[in-house]
Amino acid sequence: MRSTSTFTRTPAFLLHTLARWLLVWGVLGSSVVAEKKCASNYYVRSLPGQPDGPLLKMHAGHVEVDHKNNGNLFFWHFQNRHIANRQRTVIWLNGGPGCSSMDGALMEIGPYRLKDDHTLIYNEGSWDEFANILFVDQPVGTGFSYVNTNSYIHELDEMASHFVTFLEKWFELFPEYEHDDLYFAGESYAGQYIPYIAKAILDRNKNTTTQAQSRLWNLKGLLIGNGWISPVEQYQAYLTYAYKENLIQSGTDAAKRVERAHSECISELDSGGKDRIHAGACEKVLSAVLEVTRENGKCINMYDIRLRDEFPSCGMNWPPDLKHITPYLRRDDVISALHVNDDKRTGWRECTGAVSSNFNARNSKPSVQLLPEILESGIPITLFSGAKDFICNHIGTEQFIHNMQWSGGAGFELSPGVWAPRHDWTFEGEAAGYYQEARNLTYVLFYNASHMVPFDFGRRSRDMLDRFLGVDITSIGGNPADSRIDGEKGALTSVGNHPNSTTAEQREKEKLKAATWAAYYKSGEVALVVVAIAAAVWGFFIWRSRRQRQGSGYRGIYPNLNGLSSGSFSGFRNKRSSHDDIEAAADFDASELDTLRGTDDRSRGANGHGSVGGDSEDEDEKFGAQKESYHPSNMPSSSSS
């Protein structure tokens, strides 16, 4: 029997040992990856029902914000379609409290709307043309977000703390967006969320150490539509609005009933209720109006007074798209595509009663008290209202703006006794509303719009957004909308129709192509050097093997060299072509574009649905998809935006 020398056995032994260690590290590495996700784990590779054409680049999934109580927030992020002069990210929040931002994603500003339970169509006027859009279900327990039972949060500062934690972790996953201009937008009870989050971000930036200055967040503005912001003025506006819109007639029994409820509301406000977000007696004013407008089993729609709905829903079955969203978001293939964690044990609901009933905000002051400080810090704010919304009506918004004091003046006062004028706004030849602005605050009234302005007027809302962001397509390209303020066009904005390219985008593609060829050229030089070295080494082995053809040299040490090499590189290619690396390549493109984009920071021109229902899951199901409203009690047994 032929013996094998130690010299010939050792390399084989080393190879086997190395293989074992690689196997062990592979197992350990996979377990680490399973615990700590990266951006590719969130990449949405397909979306059931998507329209024909290339899929928009998007990511979705959960981020943990409360380890102790298993609190996770769900997000859905869409990358901007086109390149503007700088990168911008808009974070959208719906209200409630406890109502999902998937309302905003699929009924308002997102790139898609549902034609039926399984078919998506493009949303003309979506907000993702020149800005990245990030939709977040929050607080914990809302929509696709989740938390352990009995661990729901109660106050606005808790909510803001969770959101800052979310952003810290989200930017770790997607660092290419951390230095974007950051905007927050939302509606209804988000009028409480957004100012609290903005203040938390400003406080975070102030407390950031010198060493971490590169991680300051560029908060650039807030947009709040039909927001629940200042309860004192907004509660009292119910009666005024009801008379103005002829929902009730003076002197009638119906009017007297509403006036009695209004008087009780004033008494509660005068008895310490002015610093609270909720006042039970005042919520009865809204309920009274809904009840007295009841006729033949129907009442006015509190979100759009031009419509009527079954009593006691009174608008909670609206908008019509809602009937498609719940079945779509409960489909297994959609849940899988959006990376919804298995820990989310219940199906998606528009509004979650348990979140609403727990989020009482008893110790939180109304967000209107935060606005002056935010405005004075240099953060512009746009408040916009749909004229046909009752629940957060424009009269209440206009009244609290008039009473609010900031930057040395009250309301839209330009100087003592001189008020900023209202500027008429027309869009494509139609009267669209008006603008009014002073000292960093802009107010926009949308004529003939409901509580959900972007649902009614997507392109007009996008025009408002582009003005606020300072997007001017003069140097970008595209077909501008005919949007005029007091007859003047001003900055050109491009809305709707999702153009395939813009002039600026073509320029950036040419730059990227040149950069790509430069990279290929460099990599070619490196490859030549590597090939030369490899050839020299290979030649050395051939020469050596010929000299030692009769011995037990290196050929005996690596008897399966060719097979090992082939197998190794084949496996490497397979891994490189995996989904994760495809996503990595996609992210490379985005980051390259970021470096090629202009950095012009020149300033541009000025630019609740609440859950009304019980705590139980059964009650949520009983009343169907609830809607945002800031009324967690004393309302018809259902809920709303």
Curated annotation (Swiss-Prot):
Question: Which portions of the chain have biased composition (kind: Polar residues)?
Answer: 494-504, 631-641
Pfam families named in the record: Peptidase_S10
Keywords for this entry? Answer: Apoptosis, Carboxypeptidase, Glycoprotein, Golgi apparatus, Hydrolase, Membrane, Protease, Signal, Transmembrane, Transmembrane helix
Instruction: Tell me the residue ranges located in the Cytoplasmic compartment per UniProt.
Output: 544-641
Q: Which residues cross the membrane?
A: 523-543
Compositionally biased residues, Basic and acidic residues: 594-604
Q: Catalytic center at which residues?
A: S188, D389, H451
For membrane topology, the record states: Single-pass type I membrane protein
Gene Ontology annotations for the cellular component aspect, listed alphabetically: membrane; trans-Golgi network
Q: What is its EC number?
A: 3.4.16.6
* Recorded family membership: Belongs to the peptidase S10 family.
Q: What does this protein do?
A: Protease with a carboxypeptidase B-like function involved in the C-terminal processing of the lysine and arginine residues from protein precursors. Promotes cell fusion and is involved in the programmed cell death.
Q: What is this protein called?
A: Pheromone-processing carboxypeptidase KEX1
This protein's species is: Coccidioides posadasii (strain RMSCC 757 / Silveira)
